[in-house]
Amino acid sequence: MISLYLENGLFLQAQSFGASGTQVGELVFNTSMSGYQEVISDPSYKGQFVVFSMPEIGVVGANSKDDESFFSCAGILVRHYNEFFSNSRADFSLSAYLKERGVLGICGVDTRSLIKTLRHHGCLMMVASTIEHDKNKLEEILKNAPRISHSPLVSSVSAQKITTHQRTAFDFKTLDYKPFDEKTSHKIIAVLDFGAKGNILNELQNVGLKALIYPHHTKANELIKAYEKKEISGIFLSNGPGDPLSLQQEIEEIKQLINAKIPMFGICLGHQLLSIAQGYPTYKLKFGHHGSNHPVKNLKTNAVEITAQNHNYCVPEEIEEIAIITHRNLFDNTIEGVRYKNAPIISVQHHPESSPGPKESHYIFKEFVELLKGF
């Protein structure tokens, strides 16, 4: 048994199929119909519980190769967990996977009702425990826990030293990831790692870039010197967890990188940090965008792309003063992509690497390559 307490006073008891213990986090919902392993291992979900709208979870098991990172969300909530998995690439059940990673698994709850609650109230803090089942004690645990915006999440998921990435995109012929070949690399880019997904790095290297992964706290001077010495050709700012406004030191460093006119590309949190660094602070959405079925309009081509998304924050409309808006979300008209007028920078809020999700936005990685050619 596992007990749940939400900050709106809702108390539930359900079945546990993951790790044991007590976890506190922010509750969000995800509308993806597949790719639960990639969702669970996405560093952007650090400190969060994920409710899946897909009612049946576990049918393809899990494997040792599709993780986005070594980090995980706090827990997942599903309507029905299927222990009997069937997939040629599966190595173990989802239950075994969650236990190995220390992730709580909660099933037998009315996920439809929970998602409606989140749509009404917005994202809610929650505590879940396989150890403590007293409502009042769970309420006290939640009351004393820090809000997600006050937690140092990025530092817990970022690289601790400069490293290289060793593979590229998934090969559907071999059903495996292609190893990185130095001979196919034309330019080297620095990746500021705020919690980068593995498949973002795969796609960067798949378009002929070599990704050098730098810790989130890397000083701007170090990167500027590397650029001036032609050791790197540009900078990529990754996705990551938490409130971008909490990363004040990183924002100060990004300001210097912008002033140095280094070509840059940001995704998700990186997109938000580029906006904040230029004086346009982000705002929080009521319940965020989480899923692999979000329609986004490319304002240049008028094409509608179905995208993967995972964010609770957005850049403001005022960004149009210094940037051309390139993409908009068709659910709520929020900004999904920009090209800056004052610097060689492009950024998007959604995830063009998908994983999970459609691959309709993969061209954005090639746009970054084209941007680099001018410098």
Placement of each model-derived feature along the sequence:
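RNA-binding accessory domains that recognize and position tRNA/RNA substrates
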Residues: 1-206, 212-217, 244, 355, ...
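Residue-level structural signal for beta-strand termini and adjacent loop
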Residues: 16-17, 55, 310, 340, ...
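Proline-centered loop/turn at the N-terminus of a beta-strand
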Residues: 104, 188, 263-265, 281, ...
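Phosphate-binding active sites in nucleotide-utilizing proteins
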Residues: 187-263, 273
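Active-site-proximal beta-strand elements of phosphoester/diester hydrolases
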Residues: 188-193, 307-308, 346-350
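Cysteine-nucleophile active-site neighborhood
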Residues: 233-306, 358-367, 371-375
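Catalytic beta-strand/loop cores that center a nucleophilic Ser/Cys/Thr
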Residues: 303-343
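Glycine-rich phosphate/pyrophosphate-binding beta-alpha loops
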Residues: 308-313, 350-357
